[in-house]
C-alpha cells in the first residue's frame, strides 16, 4: 500500500496592500506572501490544493487583488488548485472578478453572493468552504441562507471525511480584542450544524493571526497564523489589540492510508537542517 500522505496547505491573512505600502509602516506583506508561496512550491509530497483562509487583502480594493493574483500565480502555474474565501478585510465582488477562472471563489449559481463551495480531494477528504463575511463589520456571521447552503454542502457527502473552512473562529480564544470580533451571528446554529454532521473532522479558520487549537461540537478547530504579521499574545482581559513581528507561518493538513487528519505548523524563514539521524 502506498503510504504517501495527501497534503492541503492553508495560508491565511496575507493582507496584501497597494504595491509599496507597508502595514504599520513595518510589514511588507507582499514579500511575506512571496516567501510563503516559494516555500509551498518546495513541499514534498506535492500538495493537492492550497487554501487561503481570508483577509486576502487589506482594504478590498481591486488593485490589491491584482497584486494578490500576481503573487499567487506561481501556485496556479504549478497546477495547484486554489481555494479562496473572504475575511472581514475582503470584498466579494473584486475578489471574484480578480480570480474568475483561476480559483474557486463561488459555487456558480446565478446571482449568488456568498462564496461557499466544496472541493472533493483525494484520500478522500471533502473541503467545505464557508463565507462568514459581514460587510463593514469586523466580526463574522452566518445568515439563514448561508447556513442552509452549508447544510446542503455537508449533506451531499455524509460518507466523506470533511474539513470545514471559514475565516472567523467559532469559539473564544482568550484574546479579548479578537474574541469581540469572532464568529457572532449564527454561531449556535453553526455549532448545531457541525454537531449534526459527524463526518466533519476539522474546522479551520484564520482571522486570529495566531495558531490556536479549540473545539466546536465534536470537531477540533485550528486557526492558522498569518503569512505576514501576528497578533500579540496577551491573554489579559483588558489587553488591547496589538500586532507583533513574531515568525509568520502556515498550516499543512495531512491525511492518507493509516494517517488520520493531522495538522502541522510550518514557520516562515530558512531554517537550517542540522542533522539527519
Regions found by a protein language model. Give the residues of each.
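Active-site-proximal segments of metal-dependent phosphoesterases and phosphodiesterases across multiple
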Residues: 22, 141, 157-204, 208, ...
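Active-site-proximal beta-strand elements of phosphoester/diester hydrolases
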Residues: 5-18, 124-134, 163-165, 219-225, ...
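A short C-terminal boundary segment appended to hydrolase-like catalytic domains
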Residues: 250-277
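Active-site environment of divalent metal-dependent phosphoester hydrolases
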Residues: 16-20, 58-61, 84, 88-96, ...
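Extended active-site neighborhood of metal-dependent phosphoesterases/phosphodiesterases
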Residues: 62-156, 186-190, 195-199, 217, ...
